[in-house]
């Protein structure tokens, strides 16, 4: 929380006075945060898979490949070439939406262990940091043009009491989608951060 307040103070002092230096620092913090979340997502998914029988893994993976993540409704680059062509503001806006889409579902990932209980607060901190970066880079443009009213439906069966098999499937889906989305956000923020370094090679 102290770090968030510090970032807010930096913004209020005017990031425009030193756009490169302040943006680079804010980007470094945001990238570090999403890298931590991505690694955490990978570990949680790996641990969950390890607890399954081989046939359960095969069936759940088969089902997941035929299904969609809730966040797939958020329009994002379809490949690395489109990612590299996207503006910094677009990458930040998509990252913000992806993180925001996990604020509610992430609650079901919490509990049972210290790492799981870190997810929601770390997502909140990351969302705040990305919003600061959007404001610092928007140059008068709308933050979320055309799609500010986008509403995502909850994950399937989220509110229901589920049988053992359905509960297993929902947990697998949530962990797999969380890992997938944190990888996306890490990629988008890393590319956007690289754009601030004219000498850097931002090839994915």
Curated annotation (Swiss-Prot):
A Pfam family of this chain: Hormone_1
Signal peptide range in chain numbering: 1-17
The keyword Signal is assigned to this record: yes
Domain of life: Eukaryota
Binding, Zn(2+): 36, 186
Gene Ontology terms for molecular function: growth hormone activity; growth hormone receptor binding; metal ion binding
Subcellular location: Secreted
One cellular-component annotation, GO: extracellular space
PANTHER family attached to this UniProt entry: SOMATOTROPIN (PTHR11417:SF2), SOMATOTROPIN,PROLACTIN (PTHR11417)
UniProt protein name: Somatotropin
Species of provenance: Sciaenops ocellatus (Red drum)
């Amino acid at each position: 929380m102290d770090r968030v307040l510090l970032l807010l103070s930096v913004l209020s002092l005017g990031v425009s006075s030193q756009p490169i230096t302040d943006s680079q620092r804010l980007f470094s913090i945001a990238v570090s945060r999403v890298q931590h979340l991505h690694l955490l997502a990978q570990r949680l998914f790996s641990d969950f898979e390890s607890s399954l029988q081989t046939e359960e893994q095969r069936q759940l993976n088969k089902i997941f490949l035929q299904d969609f993540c809730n966040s797939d409704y958020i329009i994002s680059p379809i490949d690395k070439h489109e990612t590299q062509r996207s503006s910094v503001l677009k990458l930040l806006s998509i990252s913000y939406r992806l993180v925001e889409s996990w604020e509610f579902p992430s609650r079901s990932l919490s509990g049972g262990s210290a790492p799981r209980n870190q997810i929601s607060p770390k997502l909140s901190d990351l969302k705040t940091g990305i919003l600061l970066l959007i404001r610092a880079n928007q140059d008068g443009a709308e933050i979320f043009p055309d799609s500010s009213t986008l509403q995502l439906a909850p994950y399937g069966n989220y509110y229901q009491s589920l049988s053992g098999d359905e509960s297993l499937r929902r947990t697998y889906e949530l962990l797999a989608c969380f890992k997938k989305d944190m990888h996306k956000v890490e990629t988008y923020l890393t590319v956007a951060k690289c754009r601030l370094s004219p000498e850097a090679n931002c090839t994915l």
